[in-house]
Amino acid sequence: MAEKNSSKYLTHEEAAHAIVEVGKRMYLKGFVASNDGNISIKTGEKEILTTPTGVSKGYMTPEMLVKVDLEGQVISGSTKPSSELKMHLRVYSENPEVMAVTHAHPPVATSFAIAGIELDRAILPEAVVNLGTVPIAPYATPGSQAVPDSIAPYCREYNGVLLANHGAVTWGKDVFEAYHRLESLEYYATVLMYTGNIIGKANELSSKQISQLVEIRRKLGINTGGTPKGKDLEYKIEDNSPDKFLIRDIIEQVTNTVLKKYKSK
């Protein structure tokens, strides 16, 4: 009978199997295309198992994975790690509680990242509890040092971040929690798209309701995610013109700009 692994870290085999499984799920969900995306798991105090560069996440095998140290230097494996590994390493460095990181380009969430719209509206109890708000990191060239620098401020307080004009990154206590947050992020973005841009109406949760959900989150041992602002009045948009972003933040920006111009006359 095999001995159960009592370490807080997965064995190499366990981690490799989990990464391959999550890679397939990301691919089948349409969160990645071609060779996009990357996944990593912390397998020791100074070791990370991660996905290789130039490989479709839907067709990975355990043998393709590569082990690196916290500086990104290869320890073992016949492949090269992704150039975006720096982003993963920064999350681990900023938040010691994190044990896994996922990065992908889920289409709806990425569209919000391109539009510059944070996922911060309290419309779904599950999103408040399991995911929290999702900020946007400033644009940085993929693979450059600017990417990890751009996400560093968000790694401790939040569970994920949108990358401007790029995609999304999520993290967690294991790779499945990190992946499920990626799923939640895309679902949350999709509902926001329907209510904000298509239906044009969303009844947001009140401050009191949000506080109750945050307390539930705390009891579940989740102390990260940020807190969305409550909006006690119904949010309704009458104009569904396709050439406008019907999202609160954009409308407020435009309104403020118009008022400034009016006052200056």
What function would you assign to each model-found segment?
Residues 1-265:
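Glycine-rich flexible loops
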